[in-house]
Structures are given as C-alpha cells and as structure tokens.
Amino acid sequence: MLLSKITFFERFEQDILSGAKTITLRDETESHVVAGQILPVSTFETDRWFCDIQIIDVMPVKLTELTDVHAEQENMTLPQLRSVIAEIYPGLEQLYMISFVVL
C-alpha cells in the first residue's frame, strides 16, 4: 500500500523548504512511494503540515554504501548522516533513498 503522507523531524523543515535537503533515507515500511506521487509533508512531532513534495525516485541503498553525495543531498556531512540514521534506525543496514522536490 502506498504512503498517503510523509513526516520529517521538525529540525529538517527549513532544509526541505529551502531545497537544501532533496532526499530522505527510510526503512522498508516507509519506502512505499512511486515516482510522480505527490505527498503532503508534516512534522513528526506534532503532525503539522508544512509543504507538499513530489517523489522523483526510490532506490534501495545500504548504510555502508552511503557517500558524501548522499550526505550533501541530506544537507549534512557523511558522519552526521550516519549518526542520524543510527539514531533513527539502530542496527538497520538496508535503507531506501527517496528523492523528492518541494512543490
């Protein structure tokens, strides 16, 4: 079943709205989106809507395969990105990279 909305931590809101963050890394349960799909975006903490995004692509990627390019698309350094992923998805190796644009 396709996701009908997506949430982000509030700390990422400005990066998303400014276009600095153009991907999100998710686990398998949050990977059910397709290119072209439009999703409302809300904050994880309070479920407050702040924009809509259009999905560009969804690709599997392993934690060990993450590069500086992925980190740049997340508007972070690679060590910061790995730390955030470990905090959100402890012990998870298989991730899904969802590319998007803000509408």
Curated annotation (Swiss-Prot):
Q: Which Gene3D superfamilies match?
A: Hypothetical protein
InterPro entries (alphabetical): AC4CH, ASCH_domain, PUA-like_sf
- Give residue ranges for domain ASCH: 7-93
Can you state which reaction this protein catalyses? N(4)-acetylcytidine + H2O = cytidine + acetate + H(+); N(4)-acetyl-2'-deoxycytidine + H2O = 2'-deoxycytidine + acetate + H(+); N(4)-acetylcytosine + H2O = cytosine + acetate + H(+)
SS bond list: none
- Active-site residues per Swiss-Prot or TrEMBL entry: 21 (proton acceptor), 24 (nucleophile), 74 (proton donor)
Which top-rank group of organisms is this from?
Bacteria
Identify the enzyme class.
Answer: hydrolase
Asked whether the keyword Transport is assigned, the reply is: no
MF terms from GO for this chain are: hydrolase activity, acting on carbon-nitrogen (but not peptide) bonds, in linear amidines; N4-acetylcytidine amidohydrolase activity
Q: Which residues cross the membrane?
A: none
Q: Under which EC number(s) is this enzyme classified? A: 3.5.1.135
NCBIfam families listed in its UniProt record: PRK04980.1 (NF003443)
Main function:
Catalyzes the hydrolysis of N(4)-acetylcytidine (ac4C).
Name of the molecule in the record: N(4)-acetylcytidine amidohydrolase
